[in-house]
Swiss-Prot record:
Protein name, UniProt field: Selenide, water dikinase
Cofactor binding, note field: Binds 1 Mg(2+) ion per monomer.
Native species: Shewanella sp. (strain MR-4)
Domain of life: Bacteria
Primary gene name: selD
Record flagged with keyword Iron-sulfur: no
GO cellular component terms given for this protein: cytoplasm
Residues that coordinate or bind Mg(2+): D57, D97, D233
């Protein structure tokens, strides 16, 4: 790249070229339900073990009696200004869906939408390199891709993985009595909105980036614990939205200890400054009827859209110590945020 191109690249702020940010770009659960309500006859394949019926993180196809193939895709608009970091975050987020099923990634294909008349191709190159870096960290190749001229920058991956069928974890198989653990703090939507509002301090920006660039590779190890009954990642629908998928799929109620939910440093300070993403309101409008009465403060935390968020684990009390030991061994703070129980009311989530 020429010196003039480098100078131009350094002055470009990618978030100014998009109307949304990261997983906050997701179509709301309510609208998505309408989109997926197909009028066509249902086609079934006995080898498709996981489809979109349970809104799980990825599709799983039975290859033989022992191995399944995992397929997923995820892409979004810039959540940070730096192109390399944007690509790395987007790729890390896409790969996470493989880990959330308990699998290991095999390869990835890039998905790129780029406003070629607004942003230099050299910037797109940096975005793709960021994606390539995340793939390298996951031990896989960025094996190809597809690009289009688009009005806003978009980047992500289609990822293929594999899973030993005995280790397959889903989001709708939790059991009453399971304890709930979360592997990353909440608050990405709040901090990235603070960035758009030019309120985010540099040190807090780096904390958010570090969290979003952390691979959820621990999921493949968590899946080998037999007492882990359900597993998913927390992304654009927020903690409450993904917890509701766990509860509704298994017909259980979550007893959530809101005070135990880990938050990114100073997330509450930015929340007090009004840094609430639009995705938070869309999330609450979509599933708020299934939640208990919440203050605006509680809504802002529970419905905050995450990008490359952590894993939500439902584990039996008998296997809880094994999970805690595994997380500690990988320098992940084991944080229990609640439990699952047989419903005693119509509420899917209650606060304790």
């Amino acid at each position: 790249m020429s010196n003039s191109a480098v100078s131009s690249a350094n002055s470009i702020k990618l978030t100014e070229y998009s109307h949304g940010a990261g997983c906050g770009c997701k179509i709301s659960p309510k609208v998505l339900t309408t989109i997926l309500a197909s009028q066509l006859p249902v086609f079934t394949d006995p080898n498709l073990l996981v489809g979109n019926q349970s809104r799980d993180d990825a599709a799983v196809y039975k290859l033989n009696d022992e191995i399944g193939i995992i397929s997923t895709t995820d892409f979004f608009m810039p959540i940070v200004d730096d192109p390399f970091t944007f690509g790395r975050i987007a790729a890390t987020n896409a790969i996470s869906d493989i880990y959330a099923m308990g699998g290991t990634p095999m390869m990835a294909i890039a998905i790129l939408g780029w406003p070629v008349n607004k942003l230099p191709a050299e910037i797109a190159q940096q975005v793709v390199d960021g994606g390539r870096q995340a793939c390298m960290e996951a031990g896989i190749m960025l094996a190809g891709g597809h690009s289009i001229d688009a009005p806003e920058p978009i980047f992500g991956l289609a990822v293929t993985g594999q899973i030993a069928l005995t280790d397959l974890k889903q989001n709708d198989t939790a059991k009453a009595g399971d304890r709930l653990y979360l592997t990353k703090p909440i608050g990405i939507g709040i901090l990235t909105t603070a960035q758009k509002q030019k309120k985010l301090k540099d040190e807090d920006s780096q904390i958010a980036v570090n969290a979003m660039c952390q691979l959820n590779s621990i999921g493949a190890k968590i899946a080998k614990i037999k007492g882990v009954n359900a597993l998913t990642d927390v992304t654009g629908f927020g903690l409450a939205g993904h917890l509701l998928e766990v509860c509704q799929g298994a017909k259980l109620t979550a007893k959530l200890d809101l005070d135990s939910v880990p938050l990114l440093p100073r997330a509450l300070d930015y929340l007090a400054q009004g840094c609430i993403p639009g995705g938070t309101h869309r999330n609450y409008d979509s599933y708020g009827e299934h939640l208990p009465a919440l203050t605006d403060h509680q809504k802002a935390i529970l419905c905050d859209p995450q990008t490359s968020g952590g894993l939500l684990v439902a584990v039996s009390s008998e296997a809880e110590a094994e999970l805690v030991a595994l997380l500690n061994a990988h320098q992940i703070e084991p944080i229990c945020i609640g439990s699952l129980e047989t419903p005693t009311s119509t509420a899917n989530v209650v606060l304790c």
